[in-house]
Curated annotation (Swiss-Prot):
<keyword id="KW-0689">Ribosomal protein</keyword>
<dbReference type="GO" id="GO:0000049">
    <property type="term" value="F:tRNA binding"/>
</dbReference>
<feature type="region of interest" description="Disordered">
    <location>
        <begin position="93"/>
        <end position="125"/>
    </location>
</feature>
<dbReference type="InterPro" id="IPR018269">
    <property type="entry name" value="Ribosomal_uS13_CS"/>
</dbReference>
<dbReference type="GO" id="GO:0006412">
    <property type="term" value="P:translation"/>
</dbReference>
<dbReference type="GO" id="GO:0019843">
    <property type="term" value="F:rRNA binding"/>
</dbReference>
<keyword id="KW-0820">tRNA-binding</keyword>
<dbReference type="InterPro" id="IPR010979">
    <property type="entry name" value="Ribosomal_uS13-like_H2TH"/>
</dbReference>
<dbReference type="InterPro" id="IPR019980">
    <property type="entry name" value="Ribosomal_uS13_bac-type"/>
</dbReference>
<protein>
    <recommendedName>
        <fullName>Small ribosomal subunit protein uS13</fullName>
    </recommendedName>
</protein>
<comment type="subunit">
    <text>Part of the 30S ribosomal subunit. Forms a loose heterodimer with protein S19. Forms two bridges to the 50S subunit in the 70S ribosome.</text>
</comment>
<comment type="function">
    <text>Located at the top of the head of the 30S subunit, it contacts several helices of the 16S rRNA. In the 70S ribosome it contacts the 23S rRNA (bridge B1a) and protein L5 of the 50S subunit (bridge B1b), connecting the 2 subunits; these bridges are implicated in subunit movement. Contacts the tRNAs in the A and P-sites.</text>
</comment>
<dbReference type="GO" id="GO:0005829">
    <property type="term" value="C:cytosol"/>
</dbReference>
<dbReference type="InterPro" id="IPR027437">
    <property type="entry name" value="Rbsml_uS13_C"/>
</dbReference>
<dbReference type="GO" id="GO:0015935">
    <property type="term" value="C:small ribosomal subunit"/>
</dbReference>
<keyword id="KW-0687">Ribonucleoprotein</keyword>
<keyword id="KW-0694">RNA-binding</keyword>
Length: 125
């Protein structure tokens, strides 16, 4: 099984798709990586030679921040925003949407399940 950046790539998939299993590598970056290294995007992971695998591993290590390093950097950025008390940091701390989305309705993913609030009693007739 091919391992790149600490991730087992699925053997049966095309290389261009398999590279997107690495955190920090999407479609565009996978396509660019294969173009730069001269490896066909249509080749299956199981058909890769060891030389091509080493070439890919070296290219990704040198040019991109992926997996653990990228996750640490993102977490540090969020932690920094929370510590300095910026608007984004406050939104992170409160578990609300950070990028200006509406919260009167929707935003259930960030806010969690609805909490029912006791309403006013109906007036008796």
């Amino acid at each position: 099984m091919a391992r790149l950046a600490g991730v087992d790539l699925p053997r049966e998939k095309r290389l261009e798709v398999a590279l997107t299993y690495i955190y920090g590598v999407g479609k565009t970056r996978a396509h660019k990586t294969l173009a730069e290294t001269g490896i066909s995007p249509d080749v299956r992971v199981k058909d890769l030679s060891d030389a091509e695998l080493v070439q890919l591993r070296d290219y990704i290590e040198v040019n991109y921040k992926v997996e653990g390093d990228l996750r640490r950097e993102v977490a540090a950025d969020i932690r920094r925003k929370v510590e300095i008390g910026s608007y984004e940091g406050i939104r992170h701390r409160r578990g609300l949407p950070v990028r200006g989305q509406r919260t009167k309705t929707n935003a259930r993913t960030r806010k969690g399940p609805k909490r029912t609030v006791a309403g006013k009693k109906k007036a008796g007739r």
